[in-house]
């Protein structure tokens, strides 16, 4: 609301969809020298939810077409359009369609980033009329997906370049297990698909200046991390003792590996002197699972079935280990944040977890976490126990330091995106 008051009204235009004229209000805001444009339509945008509405197809088609028309309205000489996920996938489709009959759009190149292939924007074949595109787009080499239309498929087909949010995920989605029904399309267009690993905002996630911590610390005084650990134990009513704390800050859904957690948690808490802290919401069965373990092991596990940003900062700073046994993970942000705070990730080697976490080698002293390969609960349990074994020796500090030295900001990723942009506008 603070920024909205500073928006400048630039004018309006209309978008034609399904034989209707739809109003588009245009607002501009300049922030740190960058011009931002905002599109307004009360019917489509004045909702309680960004998505999850019954008319999502029509809403996002409208937004996508309006974005492309905006370029001509403001007379912006655009080199590259970069869209993300199914919600704006149709931007790239419209850009290609407009280029067929309008020289203004002919030289524009397009990039599309897949953050999670699971969510594709699939709608009934009848929805094609809402797009105002030719029936020719209902074909195997365009939007057709079985007897439906698929926005994400359209972007993969019509974009000049496609990226995923990690290099390993770009390889994984070529196979049916990870491909979510689009693996054939991914293999067909593999030549234009690459992975660029996400980073984190290190100004927000900075243990040296984080306002939410009980005590700030850095690589130079990592011993002060223990102050946060003790305060975290007090905050959640856990005994203040020197045992490893394992945390999960996550959505409680199946792809986060929670079936593996379900299978081993009872044995883990029965046999190991540890404490576990959970923060997150999700599927009812997993919420109840952690409530049950909290009831059974009240002195060992604290289940916080909600999300709170301030508490997440405190957990990242106070925990010793972060558990991420994901079945698939396009990039993963939690492990990057955890390492920034010297909290050691224990992960399954998939997607971005494989790219960013290297299992510790006790001989070379290299590695910033612990990992396992197979989707196997006892492999996970073995890895947790291996992590515990290092907690009690001098190598633990080395692993913490390796984690905090890991470079997970946006600098490297930004350079890779710039390189990609330069390649396609040569």
Roles of regions detected by a PLM:
Residues 1-426:
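Catalytic cores of nucleotide-sugar-dependent glycosyltransferases that transfer UDP/GDP/TDP-activated
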């Amino acid at each position: 609301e603070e920024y909205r008051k500073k928006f400048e009204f630039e004018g309006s235009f209309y978008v034609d969809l399904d034989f209707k004229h739809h109003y588009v209000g245009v607002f501009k805001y300049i922030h740190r020298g960058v011009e931002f444009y905002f599109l307004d339509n009360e019917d489509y945008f004045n909702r309680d939810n960004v998505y999850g509405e019954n008319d999502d197809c029509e809403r996002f088609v409208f937004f996508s077409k309006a974005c492309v028309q905006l370029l001509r309205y403001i007379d912006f000489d655009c080199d590259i359009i970069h869209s993300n996920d199914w919600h704006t996938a149709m931007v790239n489709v419209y850009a290609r369609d407009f280029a067929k009959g309008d020289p203004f759009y002919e030289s524009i190149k397009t990039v599309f980033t897949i953050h999670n292939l699971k969510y594709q924007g699939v709608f009934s074949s009848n929805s094609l009329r809402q797009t105002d595109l030719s029936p020719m787009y209902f074909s195997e080499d365009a939007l057709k997906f079985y007897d439906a239309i698929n926005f994400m498929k359209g972007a993969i087909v019509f974009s000049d370049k496609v990226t995923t949010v990690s290099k390993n995920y770009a390889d994984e989605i070529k196979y049916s297990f990870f491909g979510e029904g689009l693996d054939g399309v991914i293999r067909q267009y593999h030549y234009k698909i690459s992975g660029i690993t996400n980073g984190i905002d290190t100004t927000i996630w900075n243990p040296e200046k984080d306002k939410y911590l009980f005590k700030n610390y850095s690589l130079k005084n990592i011993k002060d991390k223990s102050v946060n650990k003790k305060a975290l134990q007090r905050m959640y009513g856990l005994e203040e003792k020197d045992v490893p704390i394992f945390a999960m800050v996550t959505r409680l859904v199946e792809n986060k590996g929670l079936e593996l957690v379900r299978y081993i948690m009872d044995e883990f808490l029965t046999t190991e002197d540890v404490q576990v802290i959970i923060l997150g919401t999700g599927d009812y069965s997993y919420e109840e699972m952690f409530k049950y373990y909290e009831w059974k092991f009240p002195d060992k596990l604290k289940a916080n079935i909600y999300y709170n940003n301030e508490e997440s900062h405190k957990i990242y700073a106070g925990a010793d280990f972060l558990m991420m046994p994901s079945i698939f993970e396009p990039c993963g942000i939690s492990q990057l944040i955890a390492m920034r705070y010297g909290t050691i990730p224990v992960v399954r080697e998939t997607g971005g977890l494989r790219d960013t976490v290297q299992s510790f080698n006790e001989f070379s002293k290299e590695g910033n976490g612990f990992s396992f390969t197979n989707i196997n609960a006892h492999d996970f349990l073995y890895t947790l126990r291996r992590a515990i074994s290092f907690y009690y020796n001098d190598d633990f500090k080395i692993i913490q330091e390796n984690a905090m030295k890991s470079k997970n900001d946006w600098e490297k990723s930004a350079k890779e995106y710039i390189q990609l942009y330069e390649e396609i506008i040569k």
